[in-house]
Every structure is written in C-alpha cells, then in structure tokens.
Amino acid sequence: MLNEIFKNAKSHMDKSIESLRRDFSTLRSGKVSVNILDNVRVDYYGTPTPLNQVGSVIAQDATTIIITPWEKPLIKDIEKSIQEANIGVNPNSDSECVKLFFPPMTQEQRKEIAKNARSMGEKAKVAIRNIRQDANNAIKKLEKDKSITEDENKKALEEIQRYTDEFVKKCDEMLKHKEEEVMKV
C-alpha cells in the first residue's frame, strides 16, 4: 500500500517537472526556438490546429524562424494566428513561406521573461508540495486505519519529504539554468 503511494507521488512529481520543462521551452531566450510557437493554433478547415501540424517550422538562425505550410492557402491563416498569439513579432510572407524575424531582446524584455520563468517555477513547486500533502494525508489515513504502525508512518512521511526536496531542487536548478540562458546577451 505504501509503495503505491510512493509510486503515485513520484509519478505526479515527475509530471510537474515535465510540465515546467514544456513551459520553459515556450519562453524566448538568447536564440530563438521553434518551441515559442507551441501555443499557436491555426484555423485549419474550422479546427484550431497546432502550427507544426500544418507545415514545417524551422529555426534558420538565432533570430529567424521559417514556416513552410504544406498547403499554400494557409499562409494568411498562419500570419493571422501568429499576430493573435502576441509573441512580439510580425510575420513576413511570400508565396512559399512565412518568416519571423525576432529582434534582439532588450534588457527589460529579458528581465520580464526571467520574471515569467520564476513564476512558472514557483507554480511547479506549489504543485509538488500539493502532491506531497496528498501523499502525507493518504499515509496518515493508513495509520489511522491501523494499516501501518506509527514507525512506518514516520518513515513513509520522511520518504515523501525526500521526494519533495529532490523535485523542488530540480525545479530550482531548471529555473537557475533558464534565467542564465535568458539573461545571457
């Protein structure tokens, strides 16, 4: 029964870390990443569709992304979706593709992105702590139901705390790395 609680808690904490990793990938850093477009949806025959499913999206260099739609009539819809996504860039297009030219980030923009990263990191840590609380409640319920002894309860709570400390430390390390990446000129 305890092993199930441990496994469940660790699995949910892993998912929180993965979610944070995905969130960080959408933040712009020194060089442009195609992941900044992950949340852009294009109206494809009436269905909001991820941009990478209607064309190829590649980073040409540190400041340029090129989107080549598989169907040329989608170029206008792609432009519109990018403008609505408000990612700080205006699309340029020709008959073949859409080009996004990202200007170098100002210090103020870097600070704002770092602030967003800290907010995302804090949300992940709160999620991990909530998972710990749920696991602790389940363990205490087992002791109350006399399924485990007081000593087993104490050891189990310590184990959950070790998991929590480990995953919070991962969040902090990821945040530190992302802040360094964003602030690097």
UniProtKB/Swiss-Prot annotation:
Its main location: cytoplasm. One of its GO terms (biological process) is cytoplasmic translational termination. The keyword Protein biosynthesis applies. Responsible for the release of ribosomes from messenger RNA at the termination of protein biosynthesis. May increase the efficiency of translation by recycling ribosomes from one round of translation to another. PANTHER family: MITOCHONDRIAL RIBOSOME RECYCLING FACTOR PSEUDO 1, RIBOSOME RECYCLING FACTOR. HAMAP family: RRF (MF_00040). This is Ribosome-recycling factor. It comes from Helicobacter hepaticus (strain ATCC 51449 / 3B1). The lineage of its organism: Bacteria, Pseudomonadati, Campylobacterota, Epsilonproteobacteria, Campylobacterales.
